[in-house]
């Protein structure tokens, strides 16, 4: 399995190289050169696999240059800190199923990917004898999950930028109370997009990146997306045992990483296993406007909401989807991204029909978020966090 850039400017590289490179050297994002496929027969074999065993099978399809025993060990260590034996259990609540992604050490869904990525980094650095300075930006949950993924690990320093007073209090405390010597927290006077822009600028300076051995832990790193692909397949298998042959996923979305993992899972699985991917946003709705209007443009300033991890206007992973929209033509992706960087806008109205086939989408207001939390607590004695409430409300409104 080789990896290429969405902008077409690098030679194919290995999985090991992709993990360590993070952002491609031409400024693009890394993707597999080709996508494998999972047959119905394979799903039958995997039907009763534990989460870690399934993760081994899925990741092994993408990491052919890593010994299988080593990968197995990394996966076991990554998920040993989770509080639930199923890692990402599914709970029926009302007429919906909720995939619980909060059983990791920081209670954030990003623990699923970042516990694995931290172990991958340590493994690669031990092999090479090198070191890494991880630079990342967070709107809340990435920062604490990233820190807990690499705290105390040899050969790694981590620098996390977060928007000052724009994360939840518990997220700020999770980050700033970690006292390990390799952890550095930096508050930025601005939004998540401002922090992310600093990170991208640092990675675009190739001399600086090479001199200081920068590594990426944000969802621009392909390994993070890949780790999330696993739980979509796990959910399909679990619900398949209950007789469901086709499943809709509603995904609270800010940076487009989690729902893009669902998009990749749908490409891997037999046709029809994943029917609809519902892209749920809060009032920072650039992605909803893209799906419904073909308009991918920054609309004013980021609006602070009750779901701060989605308070994003520039979705870093969108470029990966754009690559597939453009028929895997890196030159067209590069041109579009340069236009967006210069103007804050891309006219993608020509892709409205394809986007509507790939996604449904709805923006959820603060009032709707609160009402959904209240409804689920009163009816089901189940307390939703605001991000989950956004996903549930979108699913309710777009039910077919």
Report each predicted region and the residues it spans:
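PLP-dependent amino-acid enzyme catalytic core
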Residues: 1-400
